[in-house]
Design a protein with these regions (language model features):
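Short, structured coil/loop segments at alpha-helix boundaries
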Residues: 11, 25, 94-97, 160-165, ...
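Low-complexity, compositionally biased segments
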Residues: 9, 18, 173-174, 179, ...
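Extracellular/lumenal glycan-associated context and N-glycosylation machinery
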Residues: 1-57, 62-65, 342
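Intrinsic structural disorder
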Residues: 1-11, 76-78, 154, 287, ...
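General structural signal for secondary-structure boundaries
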Residues: 24-25, 133, 198, 203-204, ...
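An amphipathic, basic-hydrophobic helix/alpha-beta surface used to engage anionic
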Residues: 39-288
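Acidic, glycine-rich A-domain
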Residues: 269-377
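Intrinsic-disorder/low-complexity, polar/charged segments
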Residues: 22-26, 86, 188, 225, ...
Length: 377
């Protein structure tokens, strides 16, 4: 009996041992399979995770004035089934668009890194402060996305136009005084439709309400009332980016031209608010490669924005002669218009154009930028 009992005990112990071994093998196998599954999922994530990511960014405004603060919005969307941990978005942006949260960079560019944890089928939106330090046209094109050791560049365009800085009250008083001492200021704001100086033939852009029906019937062609200068205002702003023989240092000259664009933006805003027609020409190069700026005469808020956008694209580099752009603007069609020329000098060429403009029925005056900006040699 003792031998039988010992044999059964040994069998039970062996069975227990086998079961422990099988369980251990099962656990180890499960762990190994789990590790292989994780590695498999890791490879899938590495391969497809970024394909399921959508990233875009944009500024809260299409345009704003230098010195103002706007926001840059980032949106990261996970269109996949798996959560994405530690997604990094790296952006390099000019210091002229200052971002207080930037972590690194240099005097020219700043580095900005956003960190995201994105759950499946989730969109995260973040707002970042941007202080507009310098007039210009700026575009962000791509962003660097990093996840699990994979890096990719995603197209994500964002564009902002920084308009000339708004004038300080002292500058407003100074430019208004310069305009008032010229002969251009003695004209009322409101047009009297019942008073006119003469009758002339219709030209493109004339309003229908100034048609003279009696003269039209008598002459057999469309005739309109030609308003006297005292009845309304059409203003053409002309910015001269030539330095001439003034001897002004290049850096200081660029500052003066920046101020001239601020004057132009201010006067354009005043003209639009009062219902006047306003246009702009400048002999500077632009970011688009053009050698001059030309904004046709018009009214309304859209025209104001067009002028501001043109100024944001302007570079303080001479691209054409002042005489040429005035000739192109006049071209025999400029009538009853006040032409205000901003320049650091007056030479024979400018005097000749002023005489030509006045001979063709316009008023013209030159605003001395050295005087209006209080420049001291």
């Amino acid at each position: 009996m003792g031998l039988v009992s010992d044999g059964r005990s040994n069998v039970k112990e062996f069975d227990v041992f086998i079961r422990v071994v099988l369980v251990t093998i099962g656990i180890v196998t499960a762990i190994v399979l789990f590790i292989f599954l994780l590695l498999f999922l890791y490879r899938i994530l590495r391969r497809y995770a970024l394909k399921n990511l959508e990233y875009k960014r944009y500024f809260t405004d299409k345009g704003a004035f230098e010195g103002q603060e706007i926001q840059l919005i980032e949106e990261l969307t996970n269109h996949g089934f798996f959560p994405l941990l530690r997604v990094y978005v790296e952006t390099h942006i000019t210091t002229k668009l200052y971002m207080p949260g930037a972590s690194g960079g240099n005097e020219i560019n700043q580095e900005f890194i956003s960190r995201f944890f994105v759950m499946p089928y989730t969109r995260i939106k973040r707002h970042h402060r941007v202080i507009l330090k310098k007039r210009g046209h700026y575009r962000l094109e791509s962003a660097k996305i990093s996840f699990m050791g994979i890096e990719a560049y995603l197209d994500s365009e964002a564009e902002i136009r920084v308009y000339p800085k708004e004038l300080h009250i002292d500058d407003i008083q100074r430019i208004n005084q310069c305009i008032q001492v010229s002969a251009l200021s003695n004209r009322p704001i409101i047009r009297d439709v019942f008073s006119f100086a003469k009758v002339r033939e219709y030209t493109y852009g004339d309003s229908i309400n100034i048609i003279n029906h009696k003269s039209t019937a008598r002459m057999g062609r469309l005739m309109v009332n030609d308003a006297d200068f005292v009845l309304g205002r059409k203003i053409l702003l002309c910015l001269n980016f030539q330095a001439g023989n003034t001897g002004i240092p290049e850096e200081k000259f660029a500052e003066i031209q920046e101020k001239s664009m601020q004057f132009a933006a201010y006067l354009a805003g005043e003209a639009i608010r009062k219902g006047w027609q306003i246009g702009l020409i400048a002999n500077c190069k632009t970011d688009s490669g053009a050698k001059s700026v030309k904004v046709y005469m018009g009214t309304g808020y859209g025209k104001y924005i067009e002028i501001l956008e043109a100024l944001s694209m302007a570079r303080t580099i001479y691209g054409n002669s002042i005489g040429r752009i005035i000739d192109e603007a006049a071209d025999g069609n400029l009538r009853s218009t006040e032409v205000i020329i901003f320049s650091t000098y007056v030479d024979e060429s400018i005097e000749k154009r002023v005489e030509m403009l006045m001979r063709e029925g316009n008023e013209a005056a030159v605003i001395d930028l050295k005087e209006v900006t209080a420049y001291e040699a």
